[in-house]
Protein backbone atom coordinates (compact mmCIF):
# COMPACT_ATOMS: atom_id res chain seq x y z
CA UNK A 1 0.00 0.00 0.00
CA UNK A 2 1.33 3.39 -0.97
CA UNK A 3 1.52 5.82 1.92
CA UNK A 4 0.88 9.53 1.55
CA UNK A 5 4.66 10.03 1.65
CA UNK A 6 5.15 7.44 -1.11
CA UNK A 7 2.57 9.16 -3.29
CA UNK A 8 4.26 12.51 -2.70
CA UNK A 9 7.68 11.10 -3.62
CA UNK A 10 6.32 9.46 -6.78
CA UNK A 11 4.57 12.63 -7.93
CA UNK A 12 7.62 14.76 -7.18
CA UNK A 13 10.09 12.51 -9.00
CA UNK A 14 7.73 12.12 -11.96
CA UNK A 15 7.72 15.90 -12.18
CA UNK A 16 11.51 15.83 -12.38
CA UNK A 17 11.38 13.16 -15.09
CA UNK A 18 9.16 15.55 -17.03
CA UNK A 19 9.59 15.53 -20.78
CA UNK A 20 12.18 12.75 -20.59
CA UNK A 21 9.63 10.10 -19.58
CA UNK A 22 9.40 8.48 -23.01
CA UNK A 23 13.16 8.52 -23.45
CA UNK A 24 13.77 7.00 -20.01
CA UNK A 25 11.07 4.36 -20.47
CA UNK A 26 12.54 3.37 -23.84
CA UNK A 27 15.96 3.11 -22.23
CA UNK A 28 14.49 0.98 -19.44
CA UNK A 29 12.82 -1.27 -22.00
CA UNK A 30 16.09 -1.62 -23.90
CA UNK A 31 17.89 -2.45 -20.62
CA UNK A 32 15.26 -5.11 -19.98
CA UNK A 33 15.89 -6.72 -23.37
CA UNK A 34 19.66 -6.75 -22.77
CA UNK A 35 19.53 -7.89 -19.15
CA UNK A 36 16.73 -10.42 -19.53
CA UNK A 37 16.85 -11.70 -23.14
CA UNK A 38 13.78 -13.91 -22.73
CA UNK A 39 11.68 -10.73 -22.63
CA UNK A 40 12.43 -10.24 -26.33
CA UNK A 41 10.07 -13.10 -27.19
CA UNK A 42 7.08 -10.78 -26.81
CA UNK A 43 8.47 -8.44 -29.45
CA UNK A 44 9.42 -10.67 -32.42
CA UNK A 45 8.28 -7.99 -34.88
CA UNK A 46 10.40 -5.22 -33.29
CA UNK A 47 13.71 -3.87 -34.45
CA UNK A 48 15.52 -4.35 -31.14
CA UNK A 49 18.64 -2.43 -32.12
CA UNK A 50 19.75 0.46 -29.91
CA UNK A 51 17.44 3.44 -30.21
CA UNK A 52 15.12 1.85 -32.78
CA UNK A 53 11.92 3.70 -33.60
CA UNK A 54 9.87 0.77 -32.30
CA UNK A 55 11.59 0.74 -28.92
CA UNK A 56 11.20 4.52 -28.71
CA UNK A 57 7.49 4.27 -29.57
CA UNK A 58 6.86 1.52 -27.02
CA UNK A 59 8.83 3.49 -24.44
CA UNK A 60 6.44 6.38 -25.02
CA UNK A 61 3.47 4.04 -24.47
CA UNK A 62 5.01 2.85 -21.20
CA UNK A 63 5.71 6.42 -20.12
CA UNK A 64 2.18 7.53 -21.01
CA UNK A 65 0.69 4.67 -18.97
CA UNK A 66 2.94 5.45 -16.02
CA UNK A 67 2.06 9.13 -16.31
CA UNK A 68 -1.63 8.25 -16.16
CA UNK A 69 -0.93 6.01 -13.16
CA UNK A 70 0.88 8.86 -11.38
CA UNK A 71 -1.94 11.26 -12.22
CA UNK A 72 -4.53 8.81 -10.86
CA UNK A 73 -2.38 7.24 -8.16
CA UNK A 74 -5.41 6.69 -5.92
CA UNK A 75 -7.20 4.61 -8.58
CA UNK A 76 -4.60 2.42 -10.24
CA UNK A 77 -7.07 -0.43 -10.95
CA UNK A 78 -9.49 1.86 -12.75
CA UNK A 79 -6.76 3.72 -14.57
CA UNK A 80 -4.95 0.61 -15.80
CA UNK A 81 -7.91 -1.72 -16.35
CA UNK A 82 -7.74 -1.70 -20.16
CA UNK A 83 -3.97 -2.26 -20.13
CA UNK A 84 -4.44 -5.12 -17.69
CA UNK A 85 -6.97 -6.74 -20.02
CA UNK A 86 -4.67 -6.26 -23.01
CA UNK A 87 -1.60 -7.78 -21.35
CA UNK A 88 -3.48 -10.66 -19.70
CA UNK A 89 -5.91 -11.72 -22.40
CA UNK A 90 -4.50 -10.64 -25.75
CA UNK A 91 -0.73 -10.36 -25.33
CA UNK A 92 -0.46 -12.98 -22.56
CA UNK A 93 2.68 -11.45 -21.12
CA UNK A 94 4.30 -13.51 -18.36
CA UNK A 95 3.71 -11.53 -15.15
CA UNK A 96 7.37 -11.78 -14.11
CA UNK A 97 8.26 -9.48 -17.00
CA UNK A 98 6.61 -6.52 -15.28
CA UNK A 99 8.98 -6.98 -12.34
CA UNK A 100 11.96 -7.17 -14.68
CA UNK A 101 10.93 -4.00 -16.52
CA UNK A 102 10.26 -2.24 -13.21
CA UNK A 103 13.78 -3.06 -12.04
CA UNK A 104 15.29 -1.73 -15.26
CA UNK A 105 13.17 1.42 -15.04
CA UNK A 106 14.46 2.03 -11.51
CA UNK A 107 18.05 1.64 -12.71
CA UNK A 108 17.39 4.05 -15.57
CA UNK A 109 15.76 6.65 -13.33
CA UNK A 110 18.65 6.36 -10.85
CA UNK A 111 21.18 6.86 -13.64
CA UNK A 112 19.48 10.01 -14.91
CA UNK A 113 18.09 11.67 -11.79
CA UNK A 114 21.22 11.76 -9.67
CA UNK A 115 20.79 13.29 -6.22
CA UNK A 116 17.02 13.60 -6.68
CA UNK A 117 16.85 9.79 -6.63
CA UNK A 118 17.16 9.50 -2.86
CA UNK A 119 16.74 6.24 -0.94
CA UNK A 120 13.24 7.39 0.04
CA UNK A 121 12.31 8.16 -3.57
CA UNK A 122 13.80 4.83 -4.66
CA UNK A 123 11.70 2.93 -2.11
CA UNK A 124 8.52 4.84 -3.00
CA UNK A 125 9.02 4.45 -6.75
CA UNK A 126 9.74 0.75 -6.28
CA UNK A 127 6.47 0.36 -4.32
CA UNK A 128 4.61 2.34 -6.98
CA UNK A 129 5.96 0.20 -9.84
CA UNK A 130 5.12 -2.94 -7.84
CA UNK A 131 1.57 -1.63 -7.39
CA UNK A 132 1.32 -0.94 -11.12
CA UNK A 133 2.63 -4.45 -11.85
CA UNK A 134 0.11 -5.96 -9.46
CA UNK A 135 -2.74 -4.19 -11.24
CA UNK A 136 -1.43 -5.19 -14.67
CA UNK A 137 -1.33 -8.84 -13.60
CA UNK A 138 -4.62 -8.82 -11.67
CA UNK A 139 -6.67 -10.08 -14.62
CA UNK A 140 -4.51 -13.21 -14.94
CA UNK A 141 -6.27 -14.86 -12.02
Swiss-Prot record:
One term under GO cellular component: blood microparticle
PTM annotation (N6-acetyllysine): residues: 16
GO terms (BP aspect): hydrogen peroxide catabolic process
Keywords: Acetylation, Heme, Iron, Metal-binding, Oxygen transport, Phosphoprotein, Transport
Binding site for heme b: 87
Residues where N6-succinyllysine is found: 7, 11, 16, 40
InterPro entries: Globin, Globin-like_sf, Globin/Proto, Hemoglobin_a-typ, Hemoglobin_oxygen_transport, Hemoglobin_pi
Top-level taxonomic group: Eukaryota
Tissue: Red blood cells.
Phosphoserine modifications at: 3, 35, 49, 102, 124, 138
Coiled-coil ranges per UniProt: none
Family the UniProt entry places it in: Belongs to the globin family.
Subunit and partners: Heterotetramer of two alpha chains and two beta chains.
Protein name: Hemoglobin subunit alpha
Gene that this sequence comes from: HBA
